[in-house]
Amino acid sequence: MAHKTGAAFSTGHITHGLANAMYLPYVIKYNAKDPVAAKRYAEIARRTGLEGVSERALINSLCKKIDEFNVILVIPATLKDFGIIEEEFKEKIATIAENAVGDACTGSNPRPIDPATMEKLFTCIYYGTEVDF
């Protein structure tokens, strides 16, 4: 995802690390619908000392901790907060989503994704809405 958005918008380059940090909580929530990935994320949360009474609670704690780090590091929570213009986002998102699905790194994702779903995920990242699919 970060590869395909870095230089896609006129409002400025999104550096690779910043994009990864911004996208990570959303991607974890998307991938956590895969049972194997969910177990792994919950284990990461446990091993880093986070608390939760269930796998889902541990994953939420992990995402919350990443969000807290991002605030400390002054990393925007959304693409909108980064300064991407909504009209430009809407104009380009279908192509960006299609290109992101075709990126070599996407093939190693624990949960398969198609262009329409990638577009939904990017839309969550733009507006800061919950990943519930």
Where do the PLM segments sit?
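Short, hydrophobic/aliphatic alpha-helical segments
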Residues: 1-9, 95-101
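Amphipathic alpha-helical segments in well-ordered regions
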Residues: 4, 26-27, 125
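Gly/Pro-rich interdomain helix-loop hinge
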Residues: 8-91, 131-132
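Short, amphipathic C-terminal "tail helix"
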Residues: 88-133
